[in-house]
């Protein structure tokens, strides 16, 4: 009896999985599944991990070029509890056939197993990534912020969405950086003679170098370095806002 029950469950699992191998099965009408992101920087494709991770939307993960987790998610049925019960109750012959092989307790466990397995499919799987205009705009701003913080102050990012057949789409991002800004000179203006003398002792350890490209992170590191150095030298209440 247990073997028969296991075969029934296995058959349901295999049938459901094969039926689910349609990547757009859970994509609503008038929506599109994101199948590819492409980033072009100054006309050249750049899909390095660092740049690609700036995007707010990534396509569904793939294993050997197969969106396996998406297929697993698609195998789940919406409202499975009502579907299972309605399916059995609406077909008296099916209920009698199940009751012939299963006891009342086993039938309840069968229904419980169907619902539990369906929930497992949802949590283990990955919902389809639907192209989202707001997230595309956020990605554009994120790309601009990244390049701005690395010295390209005139950066501009745009995008284009290409819809494909069968409710799929690709998104291309185009980044024009302009020329980078270079630090050509460094000057200091420190009102306190004590602070000025402490700063000059460690000035050679500065993260900011002449003729190097501007980077926001470099200036943040320098502020931290100066603050730590001054506090360690007795200027305990020094603030980075000074």
Per-range role (PLM):
Residues 1-9:
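Bacterial N-terminal signal peptides that target proteins for export
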Residues 3, 22-242:
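Interaction-mediating elements
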Residues 9-11, 110:
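Alpha-helical interaction segments
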Residues 17-20:
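C-terminal motif of bacterial Sec signal peptides marking the signal peptidase cleavage site
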């Amino acid at each position: 009896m247990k073997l028969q029950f296991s075969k029934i469950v296995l058959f349901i699992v295999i049938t459901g999985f094969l039926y689910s191998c349609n990547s757009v099965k859970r994509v609503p009408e008038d929506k599109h599944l994101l199948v590819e992101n492409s980033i072009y920087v100054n006309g050249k494709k750049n899909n390095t991990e660092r740049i690609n991770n700036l995007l707010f939307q990534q396509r569904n993960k793939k294993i050997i070029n197969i969106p396996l987790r998406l297929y697993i998610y698609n195998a789940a049925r919406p409202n499975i509890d009502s579907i299972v019960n309605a399916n059995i109750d609406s077909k008296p012959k099916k209920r009698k056939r199940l009751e012939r092989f299963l006891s009342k307790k086993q039938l309840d466990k069968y229904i419980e197993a169907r619902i539990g397995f369906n929930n497992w499919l949802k949590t283990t799987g990955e919902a389809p990534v639907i192209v989202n205009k707001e997230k595309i705009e956020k990605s554009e701003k994120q790309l601009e912020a990244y390049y701005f913080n690395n010295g390209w102050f005139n950066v501009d990012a745009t995008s284009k969405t290409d819809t494909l057949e069968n409710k799929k789409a690709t998104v291309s991002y185009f980044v024009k950086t302009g020329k980078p800004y270079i630090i050509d000179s460094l000057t200091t203006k420190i009102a306190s003679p004590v602070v000025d003398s402490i700063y000059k002792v460690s000035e050679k350890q500065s993260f900011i170098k002449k003729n190097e490209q501007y980077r926001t992170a470099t200036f943040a590191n320098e502020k931290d370095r100066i603050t730590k150095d001054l506090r360690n030298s007795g200027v305990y209440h020094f603030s980075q806002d000074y």
